[in-house]
A protein has these predicted regions:
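A short, Trp-centered hydrophobic/proline-enriched beta-strand micro-motif
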Residues: 45-69
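Flexible, processing/modification-adjacent segments and terminal tails
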Residues: 112-173
Length: 222
C-alpha cells in the first residue's frame, strides 16, 4: 500500500510513513469453568442487551490505523443510530476531515477524499477500494462497545475472559479484538465500557483510545 493511498484515506492525518507499531504481548486469558464462566457469559449478554436497547451509541477519541508498515493517526467521532452510522476522522492541525456514512443494508458514502465523494454497496469494500486500508467499519461499533457483531454478517464470535470474568478478547470475522482498558462505572452497562481497544487481522491494525462515551439521545456532532 502506497503512502499516497494512506494520505487519501486519512485526509492528511498525521502519517507515520514507514514507522512500525510497537507490538505488545496480549494478556493471557483465564480458563473459567462452572459458575465463574456462567457469570462472565451473563455479564456479556447483559452488556449487549443494555447497549442494543440504546437509540444512539456514540464515542469520540483517538485512532491509529495501519497496514503493514504504513499508517496514520488522528481523532475519531462515531455515532451509531439503529443500523445507520457516521464515522469521522480528523486532523486538528490541518483541520481536514474524512467521513463515512453507512447504512444497515451495507451501502456507504465517503466524503473528504481527493476527487470527491465515493459511494458503494458495501462499506468495507468501498473503504478498501478507495483507500487501500482494511477497516472493519460494519462491526467496529459493536466491537468497540464490547459486543459481538451480528453473526449473520460476520460469523460466530469466540470470546475470552480475564480472571475476574471481564471481556478480554473477541475473535470474529478473522479479526482479533483485545480490550486493555475499561470505564467500569458506565451507568446501566454491566461490566462497563471499553476505553482501549486493539483490533488486528493479518497486517491490518486498528487501535482505539476512547475519551468519552455517549448513550441514549446523544446530540450529533456537527
Amino acid at each position: 500500500m502506497s503512502a499516497r493511498l494512506v494520505a487519501i484515506a486519512l485526509g492528511l492525518l498525521v502519517l507515520a510513513g514507514c514507522t512500525t507499531t510497537r507490538q505488545v504481548a496480549a494478556p493471557a486469558a483465564a480458563v473459567l469453568v462452572g459458575a465463574e464462566l456462567d457469570a462472565a457469559q451473563a455479564r456479556l449478554a447483559a452488556r449487549e442487551q443494555a447497549l442494543r436497547a440504546q437509540p444512539v451509541i456514540a464515542f469520540n477519541g483517538r485512532v491509529a490505523l495501519a497496514r503493514g508498515r504504513e499508517g496514520g493517526n488522528g481523532r475519531i467521532e462515531w455515532r451509531q443510530q439503529g443500523g445507520e452510522y457516521r464515522v469521522t476522522l480528523s486532523a486538528p492541525v490541518t483541520r481536514q476531515r474524512w467521513s463515512l456514512l453507512g447504512h444497515a443494508d451495507g451501502r456507504a458514502r465517503i466524503d473528504g477524499l481527493e476527487g470527491g465523494p465515493r459511494e458503494g454497496a458495501d462499506a468495507e469494500s468501498l473503504v478498501r477500494d478507495a483507500t487501500g486500508l482494511e477497516i472493519p467499519v460494519g462491526a467496529l461499533a459493536d466491537w468497540a462497545a464490547g459486543m459481538r457483531a451480528d453473526p449473520a454478517r460476520f460469523g460466530p464470535a469466540m470470546v475470552e475472559y480475564d480472571a475476574a470474568g471481564q471481556l478480554l478478547r473477541l475473535h470474529q470475522d478473522g479479526w482479533t479484538i483485545d480490550y486493555t482498558g475499561w470505564q467500569v462505572d458506565a451507568a446501566g452497562v454491566a461490566g462497563g465500557l471499553p476505553l482501549r481497544i486493539n483490533a488486528q487481522r493479518d497486517d491490518a491494525r486498528v487501535r482505539l483510545l476512547v475519551d468519552a462515551w455517549q448513550l441514549g439521545d446523544a446530540p450529533e456532532t456537527q
